[in-house]
Amino acid sequence: MKIVAIARDKCFSPHSVENDYAILQAVVEGLQQPIVWVAEEQVRIAGLPPADLYLTMARSAAVLQQLAEAEKAGKRVVNAAESVAQCVRSVLHRVLQAHAIPLPPTEGNAGYWLKRGDASAQEQGDVVFCRDKEALAMQQQLFVQRGVTDWVVEAHLPGDLLKFYGVAGGFFQYFYPSDDGISKFGDEQRNGLAHHYAFDATQLQTMVEQVAALTGVEVYGGDVIVAPSGEFFLIDFNDWPSFSRCRETAAKAIVAWVKHNYLNETK
C-alpha cells in the first residue's frame, strides 16, 4: 500500500509549526511503513502524489479539493477532506446549533469573542476579545477592512478553560492550559487560573465524540469552558491538532486506528 503524509502549511500552524510536524512524524514512525512526505504547498502547486492512503493535516481549499477527488477515486484519507471542511468555524457553528450542542450564547455581560468564520485562525487577529458591544462593532469594522465578512460572535463565559484531544476508537484526554502555561496566542488568560470545577468527564467525551461524528473527523481536538455549575460549552473544535500535551499516547492511538481501519492490521 502506498502512503503519503501531507504536512500542514505554516499559515495554518500559527506558533505550532514544530508541534504539528512532530505529531505527524510520530504517526509515520509508528506505522513502520514506507511513507512519502510532502508539504501542503507542494501539493497545491504540483498535485497529489499517487497513493492508496493519505495521512493529511492540510487545510487549504485547493488541497482539500484534490483530496476529495482522490476519495471519489477510491483512495482513503485521514482526516477526510469533507470532514476538514466541516470544521470551518461558521459551517461548524451552524451544524452544532442544529444538533443542540452546548455553545456559548450570543449575548452576555462579560464581553464578547469575535471569531473569523471562513477559516481556522491563522493569526492572533482572527480571534479577538471585545469588552463590550461598542468594541465588538469596532472590531467587526476592522474585520471588514481586512476583507473578512464571515464571522461568529460568542459571549465570553467565565469558568475553567479546558483543552481536549481525541481519536476515533476511544482515545480522549483533556488538560487545563493554566496548569502548564502552554498557549498559542495568550487568549487562555482571559479565564484566569483554573478552579478545576467538578464536571462529568464521561458526558464531555460523549458530547465531543458526537461532534466528531457530525463532522466526520477522526483525529481532533478543541476547547470547552466548564462553568462553576459543571455545565460545559464548546468554544472550539479542530481537525488534527498538534497533541502537544499528549503526543506520544495520541500518536499510538492514531497508529492503532489507521492500522485497524485502513491497513487491515490489528497488531
Labelled PLM ranges:
Residues 103, 113, 149-153, 219-222:
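A short linear hydrophobic-aromatic micro-motif
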Residues 6-105, 120:
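Conserved N-proximal alpha/beta basic substrate-recognition cap immediately N-terminal to
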Residues 51-55, 115, 164-166, 230-245:
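A short beta-strand motif that forms the metal-chelation/ATP-contact edge
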Residues 112, 172, 220, 233-236:
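Protein kinase-like catalytic core scaffold
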Residues 184-234, 246, 252-266:
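A long amphipathic alpha-helix within ATP-dependent nucleotide-binding catalytic cores
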Residues 130-215:
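Phosphate-binding site of ATP-dependent enzymes
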Residues 1-5:
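Extreme N-terminal starter segment of soluble prokaryotic enzymes
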Residues 112-142:
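Conserved anion/nucleotide-ligand pocket segment
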